[in-house]
Amino acid sequence: MSLEKMGQAAREAAYQLATVSTAQKNRALAAIADELEARSHQILAANEKDIAAGRAAGLSDAMLDRLLLNPARLAGIVADVRKVISLDDPVGAEIDSRVLENGLRLSRRRVPIGVIGVIYEARPNVTIDIASLCLKTGNASILRGGRETFHSNLELVRVIQSALAASGLPRDAVQYIDNPDRALVGELLRLDRYVDMIIPRGGAGLHKMCKENSSIPVIIGGFGISHIFVDESADLARSLAVIDNAKVQRPSACNALDSLLVHEKVAATLLPQLVGLMNERKVALVATPEAMPLLAGADSLRAAGPEDFDTEWLSLTLGVKLVADVNEALAHMREHNAGHSDAILTNDLANAERFVNGAGSAAVYVNASTRFTDGGQFGLGAEVAVSTQMLHARGPMGLTELTSYKWVGLADYLSRA
């Protein structure tokens, strides 16, 4: 099917979904969860093809891990779908209302956005996350996954479409571009006659390409250098535990710590302790000249180059820099692409407020790890993306962020004076 026809079919499906009840949508989601379990062997077999192709192509172990589905991960995906069922449906909710002097009762009511195009890389669970959130909010979706998970995604979408048809909902509510030709991405970005929003999920290059080539509004997010600033007043022992969590728990995540900024007055105490912990975790350190002597015992240490503090590591590598105060920390963050998740560790309330107000990040933390920026952790259920832009949505995008609103006026045959 051509993209033009996919767009037409998605638009028609979106019209139908806009009038579907919450109960109908939940039944479809339950059918998807049931069918994922029933067809687990086919899904895992398809994923094995992707893993074998990835190994043959020389993909790193970290990338192969992102591609991998196994029984435990598939069970987690099923659990996520069932959790979406339990979440409140925002569609139809009244945001606010008032009665005008002329008697018109005016309200704002949440509605689906329409058709959402999602371009993503690697993780096959994203296919189910996006489809389930879009369905719950009455949106149709056109998905374009990475070639690395081609077989997995095809099988997952077959499961979704089968469950939709069995539930009496249009199969075309979730469609997958099954041609790996990259030219089709550009074609999707220009399908503004049918597609209402584009969500890219991947690296900085993908986001840049979508932003520059799309005639459709694009949600920019997922990329950003994550910082922790250790202030002069911080509890250093407890700070080490937070730094360890932010860097090591899942280093390939977009909310993992990239750059550690340390107040110069506590650096001589903190950094030697950090070295032992990072050696144990096999973390490579990249440091500015003034920090190098304090990190001398590190197993892996090199001087920072011009690009290092602009690098989203997605691995066991950590940049380290000394700063004079919270203002210098904020200045560094502005210069080096902060925008996703950043934190201050401090016992000084004024500095905490200065950091929260001055950081331009989608999520800012005081005395907490950057790893909390996640739809599940925020109580939003699964997320479709983490937006780092100012307009429409910011931070983890859950159900509410996949809706718009319409004005509804109720009256008794009222005419304008």
Swiss-Prot record:
GO terms for biological process: L-proline biosynthetic process. It catalyses: L-glutamate 5-semialdehyde + phosphate + NADP(+) = L-glutamyl 5-phosphate + NADPH + H(+). The keyword Membrane does not apply. GO terms for cellular component: cytoplasm. It comes from the Bacteria. The keyword Zinc does not apply. It is an enzyme of class 1 (oxidoreductase). Its EC number is 1.2.1.41. PROSITE patterns: PROA. Pathway: Amino-acid biosynthesis; L-proline biosynthesis; L-glutamate 5-semialdehyde from L-glutamate: step 2/2. GO terms for molecular function: glutamate-5-semialdehyde dehydrogenase activity; NADP binding. It is found in: Cytoplasm. InterPro entries: Ald_DH/histidinol_DH, Ald_DH_C, Ald_DH_N, Aldehyde_DH_dom, G-glutamylP_reductase_CS, Glu-5-SA_DH, GPR_dom. Pfam families: Aldedh. Keywords: Amino-acid biosynthesis, Cytoplasm, NADP, Oxidoreductase, Proline biosynthesis. HAMAP family: ProA (MF_00412). Catalyzes the NADPH-dependent reduction of L-glutamate 5-phosphate into L-glutamate 5-semialdehyde and phosphate. The product spontaneously undergoes cyclization to form 1-pyrroline-5-carboxylate. Belongs to the gamma-glutamyl phosphate reductase family. This is Gamma-glutamyl phosphate reductase. It comes from Aeromonas hydrophila subsp. hydrophila (strain ATCC 7966 / DSM 30187 / BCRC 13018 / CCUG 14551 / JCM 1027 / KCTC 2358 / NCIMB 9240 / NCTC 8049). The lineage of its organism: Bacteria, Pseudomonadati, Pseudomonadota, Gammaproteobacteria, Aeromonadales.
